[in-house]
Amino acid sequence: MEKLTDLNYTLSVITLMNNTLHTILEDPGMAYFPYIASVLTGLFALNKASIPTMKIALKTSKCSYKVVKYCIVTIFNTLLKLAGYKEQITTKDEIEKQMDRVVKEMRRQLEMIDKLTTREIEQVELLKRIYDKLTVQTTGEIDMTKEINQKNVRTLEEWESGKNPYEPREVTAAM
């Protein structure tokens, strides 16, 4: 354990890797060498940092699978960020949390739609009742004789002499 966390040991291994790469790739026109060296250095540093961390986490935690999974996901996300990707790896727990949040939001929206639909139905029923009260309904023929005091009106055939007494007559006056 001491050997894994020893800084001098880590630096000597990095120097050894760089020297090995320099001897393998002796071409001075090699343009990608610094990038390859930095990636390998980063991978080595991640290896040296993650192994002791995982050993300690496995010894101290009760649920080792979740810790290992979280460490691996964190390492891969770090590598993706170093490579310039914006995407991240998510675990099933995070996906389930997001799905629960989406389902909860959908339920809330469905409840809101249900409330609004109920209110709209109540408003339509109220408008229908108001419309029914405002519309003119035909009740058939209305007896208007009581309204104009003509209950005893007779027709021409009903008069005794056969003439209407209210019909105007010609009147001649003497001068």
UniProtKB/Swiss-Prot annotation:
Compartment(s) of residence: Host rough endoplasmic reticulum membrane; Host membrane, Host caveola; Secreted
Amino acids binding Ca(2+): E120, Q123
SUPFAM superfamilies (UniProt xref): Rotavirus nonstructural proteins
UniProt membrane topology term: Single-pass type III membrane protein
Maturation and modification: The N-glycosyl content is primarily Man(9)GlcNAc, with a small amount of Man(8)GlcNAc.
TM region positions: 29-51
Consequence recorded when altering M175 to G/K/I: Abolishes receptor activity
Role played: Plays an essential role in the virus replication cycle by acting as a viroporin. Creates a pore in the host endoplasmic reticulum and as a consequence releases Ca(2+) in the cytoplasm of infected cell. In turn, high levels of cytoplasmic calcium trigger membrane trafficking and transport of viral ER-associated proteins to viroplasms, sites of viral genome replication and immature particle assembly. The secreted form acts as an enterotoxin that causes phospholipase C-dependent elevation of the intracellular calcium concentration in host intestinal mucosa cells. Increased concentration of intracellular calcium disrupts the cytoskeleton and the tight junctions, raising the paracellular permeability. Potentiates chloride ion secretion through a calcium ion-dependent signaling pathway, inducing age-dependent diarrhea.
Oligomer status and interactors: Homotetramer. Interacts with the immature particle in the viroplasm. Interacts with host CAV1, early and late in infection. Interacts with host integrin ITGA1/ITGB1 heterodimer. Interacts with host integrin ITGA2/ITGB1 heterodimer. Interaction with microtubules blocks trafficking to the Golgi apparatus.
Protein name per the record: Non-structural glycoprotein 4
Source organism of the structure: Rotavirus A (strain RVA/SA11-Both/G3P5B[2])
